[in-house]
Amino acid sequence: RCAAFALDCFTAWSRGLDEQSTPEGNPLPPRRVVTLRLRAEQRRAIVIGDVHGCAAELQALLAKCGYERGRDVIVCAGDVVNKGPSSVDVVRFLRAEGAFAVRGNHEEAALAFATGAGDARSKLIAEQWSWTAELSRDDLAWLTALPFAIALPQHNAIVVHAGLVPGVALEDQLLKDLVSMRGLVPRPCS
């Protein structure tokens, strides 16, 4: 009985249902899943993954795609920040463009470090996350509002950062899978 209760508590924690926070301790976004329907004047949804703070490369990629503001919609599949030299510039560019994005594990870590959620500051390397001090309130609000999935019904597609478990309804997926799944094959017992 205790084991079943513990499993229920772990499942709720993994889904981010305890106290309305994610497993990292960040607040949940207003909506876990956003449905994006392209308007008549919008011709494409350009889906880009793992920008990792590389603003120049993002702009070059969009130019190569023939991106047209107002006609195309940018959809980022998480990890828009960290590792590269200009995470704050990437966030501000995406905000200015009205881009959509899902929250990946690097957004989760950045939010936790910037806000001191959970015990992130003791776990994370300060130099790797020092750029978060440059984020404005609006930048943090944008990152916090990122959903964990974006449905694109016109394309019969769902954008997540990491993965979806086959056979599990989108609303029942665990946050840890949407944000940081590494594979579908169960690991053998050691």
Question: Residues of each region from the PLM?
Answer:
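N-terminal active-site segment of His-dependent metallophosphoesterases
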Residues: 2-92, 97
